[in-house]
Curated annotation (Swiss-Prot):
Keywords: Coiled coil, Elongation factor, Nucleus, Protein biosynthesis, Transcription, Transcription regulation
Organism domain of life: Eukaryota
GO MF annotations, alphabetized: translation elongation factor activity
Subunit structure: Component of the Mediator complex.
Lineage: Eukaryota, Viridiplantae, Streptophyta, Embryophyta, Tracheophyta
Region Disordered, residue ranges: 244-337
Annotated Basic and acidic residues bias: 244-255, 280-290, 299-309
Main location: nucleus
Species per Swiss-Prot/TrEMBL record: Arabidopsis thaliana
Residue ranges crossing the lipid bilayer per the database entry: none
Name of this protein: Probable mediator of RNA polymerase II transcription subunit 26a
Keyword Nucleus: yes
Amino acid sequence: MAKMRPSVSLDTWREYFRRGDSDIFGIIDHAIMVAAADWPKEFKSRSDRIAELLFSCKVSRCIGCDHLELSIAGDEAAVEIVGVGGGGDRGDSGVATGEGEEASVSVDEVMRIRDILSNKDDEKDSVLLESLRKLESMSMSVDILKDTEIGKAVNGLRRHSSDKISKLAKTLFAEWKRLVDQWMNTPEEMAGTEGTPESLNLSVIDEEEAFPSPPHDLDIYAPEPNGFELSQILDCLDCDGNPRHSVESKHERKSQSSAGRRPKGTNDANVVGRYCNDQQTRREEADVRPMKHSATDVVEPKRQTKQSREQMVSAIQRKPTAVTEQKRKLAGPQQDKLKALDPDSKFEFAKRKLQESYHQHENAKRQRTIQVLETIPKQNKVQKPQLKRPATRRYIYWYFWSSEFPGYELPSLILNLANPRDSSSQFSRHDELMIDIPVYFGLVLVQIDKAEMVDEMMIFKKMSVLLTEKDFVDAIVSVSLKDLTRSLFVRFEAKACPKFDLIHKTSVETVRCVGKTFMHMLSKVSREFPPRNRTHPGGLLYQRFDPTHLSLARQQVAICKETDSQYPHEIVIHWTSASA
């Protein structure tokens, strides 16, 4: 963008516009319309500059005074400060810049702000904040960042106690870093340096296109030439925001510049040499840094590393030439022999080579097949421990009585579900299993062997598998062993079956409903605990129970004298021992 001429200052144009009675924005609108109508070509060519001027003009307040200043970006990303009147359309006019100060005022202003930011401990927070805002309004360039070293001063404010100052400093730092990265990645052609002849020829071929294709010379896109200047521009641009040591930065710059510069048209050997050189210098630096020596001891290793670096580069550059010479010497006699042979012998030679390659391929396939088809070692089968047959078993005999049915007054029932014939003949004694539970709930039979470890957790697991069925039981509340030889108490929360909901009016219907429920639950129990020996009634009990036994159970109905509210939802199991 062209800079404003000193002869045509803002004061002159203010007086010119104030002489008219029209609004300044109306003048702008009509001026654009007249220019587009009367000078269409010139207007089209200058439309980009007009749009750029609209977005590049920024007004900022001067530090230490209430004077407003206009910042206009120039062609070379320079910053121009022009005085602006602070009183609106009819206010006082600002001070115009002089002809000699116009080019250097931006650098001087940045240097002045840098001095303020460097003395951050002595300055007030308001002054620091205004200085950062002034820097934000300026359009910085890489040259200004390099000359003024403003990045160091702003970097020191990234961890300021004030949130506004630290946030603004981080924002400025990120923008400048992005600007420097963009400048680093820009090709030499875009940065203003001379390109290679190949790139010039390509640009001449593609000059009719809007955007010519990039040249094929990849050295133009290498960021090494700009890397040396970048380290000088922003020394403090590290990831943690800490300033780097001057000695380390200089040493790293020297190593980067020596390794980064390479002439155009270099071969692969130079690339390998540069890579090895970088690796060697990094290892040497890692070995040298932890050691603490005197000044003379430090200078001598630097000279030695320089000499060793040069020797390595020259040796690596000589290696490819020696290898190529050896290949040429070996290839020379073979080519002479091939030239001396006739076409038939050449054909035989090629055929022999082809067969050898086929044989090598087949051998490789066989080796791979042999490796894959190795014999798998036999795995030892894990033998399951055989359980000894227990000499004594404990069988559970069970009874239950019903609690009061909701909405009805039904008598308490005592049903003997065991076969009366077997109970009197095969067992010396049997005790009751009393379950205080509504009649429309399911019950369960548990068979416990003496060989098993009878504890609370084992019984709890067995009960939880059998009792937590759909439409029967929600969950077991607790399991406790009162006496391992006599009683087992299981407390659980029961769940009503919807299909038995308030349809029982007589004791006969109640007994039938209970019989169906028992049949369903006993079938599940028999699958979970199958009988081990059919001579024992522990397993035959499931098979003998059928609807015909309901008549026998109905004959044994009696009225329970105890109240049902004494043990709500509680199971009391008694068992006896019988010889196997």
